[in-house]
Amino acid sequence: MVFALVGFLAGARGTAFALHNVDPHHRASRSHHPLRHIRRVRWNPLFRPSHDSLLRQNEEIDRLQLPRIIDDAQLEELKATGELVPIEASETLRIEHGLDPSRRYCRPWTRDFVEDLSQVYYDRFHDQIQVNSAVRTVKVQKKLRRRNRNAAPAEGETASSHLAGITVDLQRRGLTKDEIRFIEYYLFYLRALGLVEPEEERRHWCFHVMVSDRYEEWRQTQTLFPHHPADETFVADNTSQ
């Protein structure tokens, strides 16, 4: 299945980060504005945020019959029962220092996904992946939405999937082109299997990834037949250049 994706991915990403050319006819006027000479990177992600994606994320939450966590009391109850588990920093994973320790939690299968991705990423690039956000309460989401009009709502059919604890935001800002491509390939493969629903958010430059509980079952098959989703596509794309 991985080889079937190689051709599409190699072509789709060829111009993803093309740069705007500087118009030579405007050099004189630009000399009065020192910052204007900086070339801007075109935003062309593989996983664009969309209304349909939010619907799919909420459909998964409804399928699992998970609650949207209302407040800190409900959050602490889910921690106590083990329905939410802690995300812990390690050699392969770091956590954004501003993330409230009380919200460094997620569903067990989501943590498995984060740990698996962080390990293969570390094996490839010898660097850590960073978690910027995990579980949120409705109260927190409403506060976030007041500050950021692009944030998902706290209620309704397109509510943020962070409210169910099945979603994490992973740092995208500061990654190299190859690092971004590696993560995109990894997510593309898992999305094709119906295991994740990813988005690349421009405002916060992060990978927003909702993880299905089906990831647990798929993960067990990888224990028997080890395979990292990004390996073959990433190698094939690099050798074709």
What positions do the PLM features span?
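Catalytic cores and adjacent binding grooves of peptidoglycan-active enzymes
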Residues: 19-25, 152-241
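Short secondary-structure capping micro-motifs at structural edges
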Residues: 101-102, 115-120, 155-156
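Acidic helix-start/capping segments at beta-turn-to-alpha-helix junctions
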Residues: 127-144
